[in-house]
Amino acid sequence: MPPLLPLRLCRLWPRNPPSRLLGAAAGQRSRPSTYYELLGVHPGASTEEVKRAFFSKSKELHPDRDPGNPSLHSRFVELSEAYRVLSREQSRRSYDDQLRSGSPPKSPRTTVHDKSAHQTHSSWTPPNAQYWSQFHSVRPQGPQLRQQQHKQNKQVLGYCLLLMLAGMGLHYIAFRKVKQMHLNFMDEKDRIITAFYNEARARARANRGILQQERQRLGQRQPPPSEPTQGPEIVPRGAGP
């Protein structure tokens, strides 16, 4: 009879140690019950405050910090769900109405479990897709998206090269056109100057001929100069025949 007493005591002793049960209970009590508690903001926080709190928490709970810790992934998904609800005005108003009406909304953990179950039955999604879905301008980079982005980059590069070649061609054509216009202008100017010079030279020749004719005419009208008359010779005295 006495030897059976320790066996009965072992059967009555709980399988889980009290410390483990207390830790689990404390973990359940410490787990946030609302999205505001999960993000660490008050219910009257602005959208910018919610965004800053999400960024701060996401750095701490991102799965890439400790890939071997599965709890980080679930907590990060809960955080993303809380940010998705509280960052949009309509969903946040509906969530606040549920809190005020007394009908308890789904806790972050329940919502995450429901979404996880739905995702297991649906098609596979890349990791951190829910995290990247919070931002409209950023998307997860899968192999197909990278190939598509690479193809788009090639197209943009081709368009840039075509524009550059077209610009060089237009620049060359414009340069040739301006050069031709300048040559035509200089030729026209040279033609005008040459014509003016030839006309002035012809006038000078004509004026020279007229002057020569006038001189000849004036020379014919004037009489030749008369010789001076000699007076009577004076014979000196003593000179006789």
Swiss-Prot record:
Membrane topology term: Single-pass membrane protein
This protein's GO CC annotations: membrane
Gene Ontology process terms (BP): protein folding; response to unfolded protein
Keywords: Chaperone, Membrane, Transmembrane, Transmembrane helix
Domain J: 34-99
Biased composition (Polar residues): 119-129
Name the record gives this protein: DnaJ homolog subfamily C member 4
Species per Swiss-Prot/TrEMBL record: Homo sapiens (Human)
Organism lineage: Eukaryota, Metazoa, Chordata, Craniata, Vertebrata
